Swiss-Prot record:
Its cofactor is Zn(2+). This is Transcriptional repressor NrdR. Residues 11-21 have a biased composition (Basic and acidic residues). Binds 1 zinc ion. InterPro entries: ATP-cone_dom, NrdR-like_N, RNR_NrdR-like. PANTHER family: TRANSCRIPTIONAL REPRESSOR NRDR. Belongs to the NrdR family. A zinc finger (unnamed) spans 3-34. GO terms for biological process: negative regulation of DNA-templated transcription. The keyword Transcription regulation applies. HAMAP family: NrdR. It comes from Acidiphilium cryptum (strain JF-5). Residues 49-139 form the ATP-cone domain.
């Protein structure tokens, strides 16, 4: 693994542990060249997923982009980082388990919305406002009218 500080190609693994959910390996590394320490996380990738955008462009699936979107929706909400990681892992597993190499972006968006609906109503509305491109207050009002009032 290349050192992110100095670019040295030969680094040493000092510690390896599975993550809490067991879906990845967390490795603590040391660079003998610059004496810096850093952490890497390794995950099993079952297949290369391709996202089909609305305009039919195809781009490689970006797990980090999915995580950023979910973190943005959950910003300042009472959901910890470990839970967010489990949410992201769950969505990625569903996408990989679908058996499809190409996934429409709309399917990913709906999976995120379904998940956020169960986790946090405010995050659900935040994500929906971007995903469904709300332009005016009436868009929010119409969307909120479709929600279960007990949530």
């Amino acid at each position: 693994m290349r050192c992110p500080f100095c670019g040295e190609a030969d680094t040493q693994v000092k510690d390896s542990r599975p993550t809490e959910d067991g879906a990845a390996i967390r490795r603590r590394r040391f660079c003998p060249q610059c004496s810096q320490r850093f952490t890497t996380i390794e995950r099993v990738q079952l297949r290369e997923l391709v996202v089909v955008k609305a305009d039919q462009r195809r781009v490689a699936f970006d797990r980090d982009k999915l995580a950023r979107s979910i973190r943005t929706a959950l910003r300042k909400r009472p959901v910890d980082d470990e839970r967010i990681e489990r949410i992201v892992n769950g969505i990625v597993r569903k996408l990989e388990a679908s058996g499809e190499a190409e996934i429409p972006s709309s399917e990913i968006g709906e999976l995120v919305m379904d998940t956020l609906k169960e986790v946090d109503a405010v995050a659900y509305v935040r994500f929906a406002s971007v995903y469904r491109d709300f332009r005016e207050a009436k868009d929010f009002k119409a969307f909120l009218g479709t929600m279960d009032p007990s949530k």
